[in-house]
Amino acid sequence: KHNWLVKDVNDLADIMNQAFEIATTGRPGPVLVDIPKDIQFNKGVYKVNKSNLVKKLNGSLSNKINLKDVNKFIEMIKKSSKPIFYTGGGVINSGPKASELLKELVSLTGFPITSTLQGLGAYPGDDPQFLGMLGMHGTYEANNAMHDCDLMINIGARFDDRITGKIDEFSPKSKKIHVDIDPSSIGKNVKVDLAITSDVTELLQSVIKIFKEKNKNFISSNKQKTAKWWTQIEKWREKKSLNYVNSKKTIKPQHAVQRLYELTKDQDTFITTEVGQHQMWAAQHYKFNKPNRWMTSGGLGTMGYGLPAAIGVQIAHPKKLVVDIAGEASILMNIQEMSTAIQYRLPIKIFILNNEYMGMVRQWQELLHDKNYSESYTEALPDFVKLAEAYGAVGIRAKTPDELDEKIREMINTDKPVIFDCVVDKAENCYPMIPSGKPHNQMLLGPEDEKEEVSDEGKTLV
C-alpha cells in the first residue's frame, strides 16, 4: 500500500507508526519500510505518536455513513423478488462482529447468500440459506442465482474475474449494491446502482438498526414475493453439482476432504491450503462455520502459501488443530519450512492430496491443449513419509478408502508435525466449473460437458 525509505534514524518511530496504521486500516495490505544499513547502526530517540496523524493515501475513508444510502439499500431490498447476498473477504477483514451482523441481516431478510473463496466462514457453511461458494468452481445453485437475480447485494467483495465469468453477460438483469471499504474497488469492474464506501461492520449496524425499526415482520410479509425464487433455487440444488463418482478401490480427493471434515468438525479446526485443485476441493467440501478458520491464497494464488501460513496460525493458536490441505507440487515449493515447524515444536498437519500432477494445470491442458500434458506430471516425487521422518516429523500414508479414516485419526492424535501422503485418483478433475469466457449459467458439471470447445477469447482469459 505504501513504502518508506528511512533517511534519518529519528524519523523511524513516526514511520513505523504510520506503517502499522496504513497496513491495518481501510483495505488491509502490505507496506514496506526500507531501513538502510547505516541507519540500522545509529541510535535515535523514540517518540510516542500522540497526534495520530497518519499520511493520507488515495482511498482513505471518512467513516461517515450516509443515511440516504442506508435507506436506499433497504428500499432496494424491499422491492426485490429475486435477491442474493454476495459476500467476500471484506466481511472477514472487518472483524468477527461483521460476521455476526451478516448472519443477523440474512436471517432478518430470509434471502439466499453466497460467498467468494476468501469470504468462506463469514456465514455458516451448513446453513440452508447458504448456497455455497460461487465463481469458477462454485456451485450450480450459487452461480445460477447470481446470473438470474434481480438484486445483487455485494458486501466486501470486488467483482473479480474468477467470480464474474464473461463480464458483459454477468448478471444482466440485476440491480447491484456494492459495499466496500476501498472506493477504488467500486465501479472498477462492474457498474453498480448503489455504491457505499464503508467498513462492513459499520454499514451493517446502520442497516440492521433501521431495518428492524421499519420492517418488523419483513420475512412473513415478503415470503410470497420470494417463494418462486426459492423454488427455483431448490431446483438448481437438485442438480447436486458437487456430487462425484466415488470408488471402493481408489481414494477420490473429494472423499478425502469430506472425511477430513467429518473427523475434525467437532474441533475448532483451522485450515490453510496451497493452490490448485486441492484448494478448490477444500473450498467445496469443507464447511466453515466461523470466520478466520480458512486461510488461502485467493488473489495472487501463490503455490507454497499453505505451509508457512499453517506455521503462523499454529503459533497464534498453539492448542488448536491446524491442517494444511496441500497438493504434492505446491507443498514442495516451501517444504524447507518443515524445519521451522520442528524447531518450534509446532504440531501442524500437512494433508497432501497426491495425484502426481499439477492437477489444475493438467485440467486446463485437457480443456485447451488436446491433453498435451507438458510439464504437469511429476514422476520423480520424494517419498513423503521418509521426507517427514528426515525432518523429524511423522509420516503417514493412505492408499485405499478403507484405511483413510483410521489414518486421519492417527494424524489428528499425533502431537508432532505430520506429513500425510493421501494417494488419490490421478485423473480426477475439479467440477463444477465455468469455462473461461463463459457466463455463470453455462457451467460444466462433469467430463461429459467438456465436448463444447472453449472460444479463442476464452482461452486468453485463463
Q: What annotation goes with each model-predicted range?
A:
Residues 143, 148, 187-189, 195-197, ...:
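Thiamine diphosphate
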Residues 21-27, 69-85, 105, 146-148, ...:
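Glycine-rich phosphate/diphosphate-binding loops that line cofactor/substrate pockets in enzymes
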Residues 1-14, 37, 119-228, 408:
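Glycine-rich, acidic loop regions that bind phosphate or pyrophosphate groups
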Residues 1-41, 117-120, 146, 156-178, ...:
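Conserved thiamine diphosphate
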Residues 89-177, 288-320, 332-335, 366-367, ...:
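Glycine-rich, anion-gripping cofactor-binding loops and their flanking helix/strand elements
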Residues 231-308, 313:
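Active-site diphosphate/adenylate-binding microenvironment
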Residues 18, 22-79, 242, 443-445:
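Conformationally flexible catalytic loops at phosphate/diphosphate-handling active centers
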Residues 35-40, 89-91, 183, 275-277, ...:
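Glycine-rich beta-alpha junction loops
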